[in-house]
Amino acid sequence: MPHPSSRQAHLVLADGTVLTGDAFGHRGSVVGEVVFNTGMTGYQEVLTDPSYAGQLVTFTYPELGNTGVNGDDQEADHPHARGVIARQLAPCASNWRCSESLDNWMERHGLVGICGVDTRALVRRLRDGGAINGVISSDGRSPADLLAEVRHAPSMEGLNLASQVSTTEPYEWSSPCRVGFDQRLKQHPDLPYRVVAIDFGIKRAILDRLVAHGCAVTVLPSDADLDTVMSHQPEGVFLSNGPGDPAAVDSGIDLARSLLERANLPLFGICLGHQILGLALGGKTFKLGYGHRGLNHPCGTSGQVEITSQNHGFAISADSLPEPMVEVTHLNLNDRTVAAFQHRHQPVFGIQYHPEASPGPHDADHHFGRFVALMADRRDVGG
């Protein structure tokens, strides 16, 4: 549905493709990598997830904004996606928690959107040709001018975006900011486990799940070094999700390598953190054609499958991980890429998907308990 005060907008891809629709949200122009998310719900969590920094997100579900936005479902204080591409904008929002329409929220936060375009055709283009840079614009410029702009935009490969979304100051996170799903947890320890989380673009839901599993979390900037981490006397270190190319996050790789070599602490990485752990162990990463962004990706090896929430454009090359030191424990069953690994001799593991969901299924929440169990074992032996 067109915006009530509709203005024409263009989406121009770097290959010359032009789609014309209606502007919504903030009026203006923005360049980013065009990707797609196949989830039917959770657009507020997606748009505020720092892992989407630098991207124009196409939603495959045909209508957006049905439930508006609320104060609980944000993964950060503000949106991190650069733009929104939708087939249709809902004419009204209806939900008991709704505090604002998606359109107004996007306008307030300066988030540019385009609707009324053939998202099915666009997703087929991205699926067949891969993610590509594009520009959304409602500022009146011609498609030819926009094409010239987007062709000068940098590729996602080689970009360290984690440094742009990370906190600049340490902070503590010890109580959940919202009520979550049925946690099904055992009694918390009398003394919470001290966890240092390295913020490459961390989601609030991850912090909430760590707390729900009995952790007191100190969040440090993405450029924290080993001395800074160890000064907090952690019982475990968590490497967070985040945007961009993992191979460009030199400080994170150096820290993970130092932790592996000198700290002998439980290490747990999710998404970008998983990739950084893999790189620190000697592995290599590569860019996926169009990435994994959705809520129903099956992952496993044999005997048990987890339906998972995913959001990443890079993956670890299975052949690059050092054997037998590192074991691949889960594969994405859609394309057989590495979904999780563990170290055979150290309390270290990484998973490519999102056990905290938000949005998505909770099949993989037990990985937080797995991390806590490693810290409990270390505490029991006086580590």
From Swiss-Prot:
Record-annotated active site: C271 (nucleophile), H354, E356
Disulfide partners: none
Domain of life of the organism encoding this protein: Bacteria
Pathway: Amino-acid biosynthesis; L-arginine biosynthesis; carbamoyl phosphate from bicarbonate: step 1/1; Pyrimidine metabolism; UMP biosynthesis via de novo pathway; (S)-dihydroorotate from bicarbonate: step 1/3
Alphabetic keyword roster: Amino-acid biosynthesis, Arginine biosynthesis, ATP-binding, Glutamine amidotransferase, Ligase, Nucleotide-binding, Pyrimidine biosynthesis
Region (CPSase): 1-190
Molecular function terms, GO-annotated: ATP binding; carbamoyl-phosphate synthase (glutamine-hydrolyzing) activity; glutaminase activity
Pfam families, alphabetized: CPSase_sm_chain, GATase
Catalytic activity reported: hydrogencarbonate + L-glutamine + 2 ATP + H2O = carbamoyl phosphate + L-glutamate + 2 ADP + phosphate + 2 H(+)
SUPFAM superfamilies, sorted: Carbamoyl phosphate synthetase, small subunit N-terminal domain (SSF52021), Class I glutamine amidotransferase-like (SSF52317)
Gene Ontology terms describing biological process: 'de novo' pyrimidine nucleobase biosynthetic process; 'de novo' UMP biosynthetic process; glutamine metabolic process; L-arginine biosynthetic process
Domain Glutamine amidotransferase type-1, residue spans: 194-381
Major enzyme class: ligase
Binding site for L-glutamine: S51, G242, G244, L272, Q275, N311, G313, F314
EC number: 6.3.5.5
Function: Small subunit of the glutamine-dependent carbamoyl phosphate synthetase (CPSase). CPSase catalyzes the formation of carbamoyl phosphate from the ammonia moiety of glutamine, carbonate, and phosphate donated by ATP, constituting the first step of 2 biosynthetic pathways, one leading to arginine and/or urea and the other to pyrimidine nucleotides. The small subunit (glutamine amidotransferase) binds and cleaves glutamine to supply the large subunit with the substrate ammonia.
Subunit (UniProt): Composed of two chains; the small (or glutamine) chain promotes the hydrolysis of glutamine to ammonia, which is used by the large (or ammonia) chain to synthesize carbamoyl phosphate. Tetramer of heterodimers (alpha,beta)4.
Family: Belongs to the CarA family.
Protein name listed in UniProt: Carbamoyl phosphate synthase small chain
